[in-house]
């Protein structure tokens, strides 16, 4: 995108790191051709590959648009006539009839044309990546039988990119899946506070429509609430549905409470019951039998007003045992549903364990757990957009009905009836403003991938932070294998936002399923069944690491299993139904990338998972020495690496593109992204990892992206770490770094900022982008070209002009001389002011790209804009004091000191360590994983050789017996290197070039003080830890101001870096000044340094002229206080010490105006001033 990039493309040399090998031992890497040879400590064979990590997004959108791939999958699943989401909406809407029923309009066959522009062009030109949607509309005149059919354009429909994102107005966005309570019937149990009786209630919750609630109160009567209105006896509703007293007695005669309710019910028959319900629902309106009948029918039995949705119908049938085995057709309530719900409630209250339904089926009678994943479902992207289209279509329906009545019947065509504006507006509103359509997190590939797999309980129709209690936020046994128990935010959203587990998938009803291996008669098979949380509760499940023999039988007679509600016990192997497919089944992608997760406290693991998403792409990426085997799949599915689509031979390679000659004779060119800006200002750059003539297979990674190396996720650096205190400089999580990391750009990152300016038409004339700027020296204009735009490659710092622009000034009455000049020189003498785009305060860098859009070149620009210029400035940020670093175990800290390399502690062979962490950061935080990672990192870096067959190495595979230095390893979560294996390998490491082993078998080494050369008194843990540089950079936080913008009302400086604000001297700081008796300092702080508007200009003048500081005046906030008191009708006057009234002058002082004019400054800038004007 950015032409003329002058940044060096740092590519790692092939000798630097181990090269690709097609036979990686990790179960994950082995399935990808050309995967790096990462040897794995995994002991378990996984029968199932990790599914596509973006399927939750892509499959859902394919359902919405009815894509061919989705149709094939649906037919294979057994759906006779699969319907896409758009088709469903059109079928619901059709036909739209006029009020008399003489005309109707129906819609069918939604289809898309080609997308208007490719993804890159949409990002570049602020366009939406969308395809035109067409439907077939059919108008039928029922009086004449005339049919008119037309293809109607329904607006541009945003399309999903291959990466599962949307491009809306040039920015990449993600639609987050929403966790909501499923429609259905829910039984609850509460204890009455006064009588301590157990009360029961039931809610019938639809997808759309009125709620129906039944309950048994403390007087043992059964009541009903319709649409949250007043409670009335349940028999009133039954009578309104046409039941007689005899029928009620016959069905519910077994229940005393139903009989007592019937006795207390004083309505005589169906008509009275209907009128009674009508009075409760519509108080104040005159009731009639017909209106009451219509109201009840509309509330629950008409599809237009009431919709349980397929999932609600499925849940009701399942709970009440109705229509077993029948296909789901209706989505409204039925009389049978209401009666069965009441019977279930009554039997629940009477403590009966089961209920026999009319079909002879027995269903268990029990209350529901609302937080169970059998009762919570996902609204994925397709359903969220479908709901929004439904809203737009219903608005359009009203317009169509009105037009049917007003237009001439002969002239009506579908096109004249349809107004697509409400539909287009509804879709735009959803993508632009919905809480679930979010600006994509593009800090690094992992953060983007995690964002697409996020599950949110917030949003429209969901929970709110304030109302959500502890239960809904807590980890639930049914989350196992569905939602990660670790990865969730730390703040007010904790537990409300989660992440999909690695193997989880979403079924057609929106429930999350997780896979299990079928166990038959104690033999574990490779047959995979996906189970929802409800189905899993009915089975006995063994964990993935249960020992099994060669024939697949459980090695032990009794197996550790879990049953319903997460109860854990030992049972005979013959009772086991299923077994987990993988130990990492319960965690998310980010959590699965934490090695030795099983040794970390959950709170710290949560921080580790979250902080990996904040890692900044470094200039040189480096894959971890100690990984988990998840790095490759995560990087490929994140979509930031380039993958070969077909097998073939590399024909040509350059920094910008790779050409592959496929085996089928076709040629494919892959373009690299070069130094593009991500949504978060980090640098997205791709570079080839293949050479011309190399053979590549389909699915092989041929170019690395940001934060990847050899196709694996590489978020940080492997650094030599010593865990020890050092002169107190690493107290309280501070970190000491070696200057080598600064000098050799080890932790250097590139950040790209985008600066934009447009030239508009104003009331006084058009703005102009030009080099001809008033009152600016040639030095300032040196880097601008003839158009007034900065040249590529220019070094700029804050205040420098990036794009010159002048805006016409408001004209005053012209003098005769000015009129003469205007007559002679024409427009040239017009007054203009400098409104150029300048580098904001505190920023600097190198200009790496410029984009110019102009109306003259037929570029699409907003109304009133003639020209738009974007300038991209790249900044190379070396690591510095105040930057935040973190490991993968929640071990984070701020750099407290950067020491010269020669002062760092060093190993006996003279190797200085890179980073010193404090020992106190480990014990109380209980993240021991970082210590084990450090030890294994040293083993991997040094290489190892295991002689003989020691007891601890019995279970190690052959490839782990010996390895050369720099061997990358993986230790999968819950199936990684054991403590005794680690201890054994530490004593088998290869010696260095002098034949010495630096680190002992306990993982410690004798370190020497770099300043004195003396050894430290105790051995120190030394090894390699994977350290990430986080997005919290000191350069973004440090801020200084002398003068700047002030608040309009109080005239006090604004606050915060973004507003170029000042430092607040608050109430407690004033007390400190009072305590020290610093009266003059305090007076200065409260007046001339704050909001004494006249005083601050006079002080500025005195400083410039070298005079003494004048007396302060009256602060503006005091005048505001007076005005507030006067607004309360209090007459407040300011008196001098001798009782004379002091007049507070309004407006600006004459002295102020004179001084400001003489100095050529404007110190009373208000908050409307932009930061650019301050430089």
Curated annotation (Swiss-Prot):
GO biological process, one term: DNA-templated transcription
InterPro entries, sorted: DNA-dir_RNA_pol_bsu_ext_1_sf, DNA-dir_RNA_pol_bsu_external_1, DNA-dir_RNA_pol_su2, DNA-dir_RNAP_su2_dom, DNA-dir_RNAP_su2_hyb_sf, RNA_pol_bsu_bac, RNA_pol_bsu_CS, RNA_pol_bsu_protrusion
Catalytic activity: RNA(n) + a ribonucleoside 5'-triphosphate = RNA(n+1) + diphosphate
Keywords: DNA-directed RNA polymerase, Nucleotidyltransferase, Transcription, Transferase
An example molecular function term from Gene Ontology annotations: ribonucleoside binding
NCBIfam families the record matches: PRK00405.1 (NF001616), rpoB (TIGR02013)
SUBUNIT field: The RNAP catalytic core consists of 2 alpha, 1 beta, 1 beta' and 1 omega subunit. When a sigma factor is associated with the core the holoenzyme is formed, which can initiate transcription.
Family the UniProt entry places it in: Belongs to the RNA polymerase beta chain family.
Protein name as catalogued: DNA-directed RNA polymerase subunit beta
């Amino acid at each position: 995108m950015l032409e003329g990039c002058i940044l060096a493309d740092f590519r790692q040399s092939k000798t630097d790191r181990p090269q690709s090998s097609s036979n990686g031992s990790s179960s994950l890497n082995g399935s990808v051709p050309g995967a790096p040879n990462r040897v794995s400590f995994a002991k378990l064979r996984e029968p199932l590959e990790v599914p596509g990590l973006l399927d939750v997004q892509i499959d859902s959108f394919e359902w919405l648009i009815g894509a061919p791939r989705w149709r094939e999958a649906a037919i294979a699943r057994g759906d006779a006539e699969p319907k896409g989401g758009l088709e469903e909406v059109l079928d619901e809407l059709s036909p739209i009839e006029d009020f008399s029923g003489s005309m109707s309009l129906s819609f069918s066959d939604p289809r898309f044309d080609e997308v208007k522009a490719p993804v890159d062009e949409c990002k570049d030109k602020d366009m939406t990546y969308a395809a035109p949607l067409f439907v077939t509309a059919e108008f039928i005149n029922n009086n004449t039988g005339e049919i008119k059919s037309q293809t109607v354009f329904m607006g541009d429909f945003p399309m999903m990119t291959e990466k599962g994102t949307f491009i809306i107005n040039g920015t990449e966005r993600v639609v987050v899946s929403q966790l909501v309570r499923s429609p259905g019937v829910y039984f609850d149990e509460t204890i009455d506070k006064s009588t301590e009786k157990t009360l029961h209630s039931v809610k019938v919750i639809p997808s759309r429509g009125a709620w129906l609630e039944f309950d048994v109160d403390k007087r043992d009567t059964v009541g009903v609430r319709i649409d949250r209105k007043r409670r009335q006896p349940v028999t009133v509703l039954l009578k309104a549905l046409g039941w007689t007293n005899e029928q009620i007695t016959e069905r519910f005669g077994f229940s005393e409470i139903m009989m007592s309710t019937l006795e207390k019910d004083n309505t005589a028959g169906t008509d009275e019951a209907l009128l009674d319900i009508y009075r409760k629902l519509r108080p104040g309106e005159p009731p009639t039998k017909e209106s009451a009948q219509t109201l009840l029918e509309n509330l629950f039995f008409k599809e237009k007003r009431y919709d349980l949705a397929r999932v609600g119908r499925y849940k009701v049938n399942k709970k009440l045992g109705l229509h077993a085995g029948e296909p789901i057709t209706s989505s409204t309530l039925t009389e049978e549903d209401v009666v069965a719900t009441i019977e279930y409630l009554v039997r629940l209250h009477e403590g009966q364990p089961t209920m026999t339904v009319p079909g002879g089926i027995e269903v268990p009678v029990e209350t529901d757990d609302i937080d169970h994943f059998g009762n919570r479902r996902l609204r994925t992207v397709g359903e969220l957009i479908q709901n929004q289209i439904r809203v737009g279509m219903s608005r359009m329906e009203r317009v169509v009905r009105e037009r049917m009545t007003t237009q001439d019947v002969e002239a009506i065509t579908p096109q004249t009836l349809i107004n697509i504006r409400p539909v287009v507006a509804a879709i735009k509103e959803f993508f632009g403003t919905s809480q679930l359509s979010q600006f994509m997190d593009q800090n690094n590939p992992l953060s983007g991938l995690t964002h697409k797999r996020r599950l949110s309980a917030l949003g429209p129709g969901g929970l709110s932070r304030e109302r959500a209690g502890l239960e809904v936020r807590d980890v639930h046994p049914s989350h196992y294998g569905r939602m990660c128990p670790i990865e969730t935010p730390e703040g007010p959203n904790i537990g409300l936002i989660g992440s999909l587990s690695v193997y989880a998938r979403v079924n057609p009803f929106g429930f999350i399923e997780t896979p299990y291996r079928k166990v038959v008669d104690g033999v574990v098979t490779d047959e995979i069944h996906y189970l929802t949380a409800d189905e899993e509760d009915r089975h006995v499940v063994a964990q993935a690491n249960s020992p099994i023999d060669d024939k697949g039988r459980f090695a032990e007679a009794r197996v550790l299993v879990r049953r319903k509600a997460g109860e854990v016990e030992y049972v005979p192997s013959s009772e086991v139904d299923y077994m987990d497919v993988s130990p990492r089944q319960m965690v998310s992608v980010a959590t699965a990338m934490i090695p030795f997760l099983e040794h970390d406290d959950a709170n710290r693991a949560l921080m580790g998972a979250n902080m990996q998403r904040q890692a900044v792409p470094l200039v040189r990426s480096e894959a971890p020495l100690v990984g988990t085997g998840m790095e490759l799949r995560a990087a490929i599915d994140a979509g930031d690496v380039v993958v070969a689509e077909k097998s073939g031979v590399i024909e040509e390679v350059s920094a910008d593109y790779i050409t592959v000659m496929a085996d089928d004779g076709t040629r494919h060119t892959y373009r690299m992204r070069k130094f593009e800006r991500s949504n978060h200002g980090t640098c997205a750059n791709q570079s080839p990892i293949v050479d011309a003539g190399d053979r590549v297979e389909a699915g092989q990674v041929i170019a690395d992206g940001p934060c990847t190396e050899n196709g694996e996720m590489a978020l940080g650096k492997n650094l030599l770490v010593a865990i020890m205190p050092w002169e107190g400089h690493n107290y309280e999580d501070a970190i000491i770094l070696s200057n080598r990391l600064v000098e050799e750009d080890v932790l250097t990152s590139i950040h790209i900022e985008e600066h934009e300016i447009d030239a508009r038409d104003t009331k006084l004339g058009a703005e102009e982008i030009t080099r001809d700027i008033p009152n600016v020296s040639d030095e300032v204009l040196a880097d601008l070209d003839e158009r007034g735009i900065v040249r590529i490659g220019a070094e700029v710092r804050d205040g420098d002009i990036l794009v010159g622009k002048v805006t016409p000034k408001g004209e005053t009455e012209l003098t005769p001389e000015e009129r003469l000049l205007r007559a002679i020189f024409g427009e040239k003498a017009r007054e203009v002011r400098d409104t150029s785009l300048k580098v904001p305060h505190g920023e600097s860098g190198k200009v790496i790209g410029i984009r110019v859009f102009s109306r003259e070149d037929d570029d699409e620009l907003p109304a009133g804009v003639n020209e738009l210029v974007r300038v991209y400035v790249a900044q190379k940020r070396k690591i510095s004091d105040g930057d935040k670093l973190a490991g993968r175990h929640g071990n984070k800290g701020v750099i407290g000191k950067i020491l010269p390399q020669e002062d760092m502690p060093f190993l006996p062979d003279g190797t200085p360590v890179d980073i010193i962490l404090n020992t106190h950061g480990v014990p109380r935080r209980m993240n021991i994983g970082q210590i084990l990672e450090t030890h294994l990192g040293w083993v991997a870096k040094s290489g190892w050789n295991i002689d003989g067959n020691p007891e601890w190495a019995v279970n190690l595979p052959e490839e782990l017996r010996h390895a050369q230095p720099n061997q990358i390893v993986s230790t999968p979560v819950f199936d990684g290197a054991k403590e005794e294996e680690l201890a054994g390998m530490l004593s088998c490491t290869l010696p260095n070039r002098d034949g010495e082993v630096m680190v002992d078998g306990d993982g410690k080494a004798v370190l020497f003080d770099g300043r004195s050369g003396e050894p430290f008194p105790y051995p120190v843990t030394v090894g390699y830890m994977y350290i990430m540089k986080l997005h919290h950079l000191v350069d973004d936080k440090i801020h200084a101001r002398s003068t700047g913008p002030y608040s309009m009302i109080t005239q006090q400086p604004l606050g915060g870096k973004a507003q170029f604000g000042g430092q607040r001297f608050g109430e407690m700081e004033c007390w400190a000044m009072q305590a020290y008796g610093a009266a003059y300092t305090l007076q200065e702080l409260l007046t001339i340094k704050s909001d004494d508007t006249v005083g601050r200009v006079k002080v500025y003048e005195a400083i410039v002229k070298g005079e003494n500081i004048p007396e302060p005046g009256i602060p503006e906030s005091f005048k505001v206080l007076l005005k507030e008191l006067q607004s309360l009708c209090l007459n407040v006057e300011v008196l001098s010490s001798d009782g004379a009234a002091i007049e507070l002058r309004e407006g600006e002082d004459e002295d102020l105006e004179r001084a400001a004019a003489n100095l050529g400054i404007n110190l009373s800038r208000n908050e409307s001033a932009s930061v650019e004007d301050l430089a």
